[in-house]
């Protein structure tokens, strides 16, 4: 009788959320590589104490760097951005159509270099991974982003935002987002981050995002950003006091 030694278990594939990479999915309205270079330069030169790390929801709000010639499209509410960041040196590290792995690449290639060691870092990522990844893969990618931040900025205070609501034809999207937000809340508790869900103020009681707050059911309008800022500004002030 032939005895066959059992082999090692099959290697678990590394999820895409943990493989840093660049992207150019939004090339029609901005240049990803140029924005990255501008962001690195601003961080080096201004030594920010407030960083917003995210995708288009963050990118389209306001602040520097500014993408020319599409300033009007990509700066939906610079007034509320200024109110939310008042008294701090803020940089907008939001990049349209970024997935978690794209933000991870950016942070590993200079976007944190020069920031204050105790900077407040506001993180909102993952909605662009919903169609590509499992909830667990998204969570692990966001965890990796947060560890990248604390690995480079030892005293950073991380504000982890839950996913914003989105009007979707895909059944179960709202329930999935609610489940992911529970996971993010748990991650924040484990890692001593601050967790917040300002996106809740974007939706009606039935979970629908009205047109006056978002023309596409996800990205805030100026009125939507005003609501977000009203929730987020006091959380940022609370975070800034942690290291004083």
Predicted regions and their residues:
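Serine-esterase "nucleophile elbow" of acetyl-processing enzymes
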Residues: 2-96, 101-116
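Structural recognition of the beta-strand scaffold that forms the well-ordered cores
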Residues: 49-54, 89-94, 119-125, 129, ...
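Catalytic His-Asp segment of secreted/periplasmic serine-dependent ester chemistry enzymes
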Residues: 165-244
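Glycine-rich anion/phosphate-binding loops
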Residues: 98-105, 133-142
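Surface-exposed cleft-lining segments at the edges of enzyme active sites
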Residues: 92-95, 125-138, 166-173
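Proline-centered flexible-loop/turn and helix-kink motifs
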Residues: 86, 154-155, 189
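Mature catalytic domains of secreted/periplasmic carbohydrate-active enzymes
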Residues: 9-12, 21-22, 26-31, 142, ...
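Charged helix-capping and loop-helix junction motifs
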Residues: 137-145, 174-181
């Amino acid at each position: 009788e032939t005895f066959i030694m059992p082999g090692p278990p099959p290697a678990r594939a590394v999820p895409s959320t943990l493989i840093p990479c660049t992207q150019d999915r939004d090339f029609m309205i901005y240049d990803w590589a140029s924005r990255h270079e501008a962001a690195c330069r601003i961080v080096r030169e201004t030594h920010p104490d407030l960083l917003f790390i995210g995708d288009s929801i963050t990118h389209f709000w306001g602040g520097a760097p500014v993408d020319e010639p599409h300033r009007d499209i990509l700066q939906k509410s610079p007034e509320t951005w200024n109110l939310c960041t008042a008294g701090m040196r803020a940089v907008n590290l939001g990049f349209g159509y970024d997935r978690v792995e794209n933000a991870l690449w950016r942070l590993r290639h200079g976007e944190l270099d020069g920031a204050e060691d105790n900077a407040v870092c506001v993180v909102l990522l993952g909605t662009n991974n919903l169609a590509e990844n499992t909830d667990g893969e998204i969570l692990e990618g966001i965890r990796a982003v947060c560890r990248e931040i604390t690995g480079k900025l030892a005293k950073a205070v991380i504000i982890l935002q839950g996913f914003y609501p989105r009007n979707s034809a895909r059944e179960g999207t709202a329930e999935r987002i609610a489940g992911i937000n529970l996971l993010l809340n748990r991650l924040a508790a484990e890692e001593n981050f601050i967790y917040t869900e300002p996106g809740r103020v974007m939706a009606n009681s039935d979970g629908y995002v009205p047109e006056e707050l978002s023309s596409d059911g996800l990205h805030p309008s100026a009125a939507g950003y005003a609501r977000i800022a009203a929730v987020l500004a006091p959380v940022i002030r609370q975070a800034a006091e942690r290291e004083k």
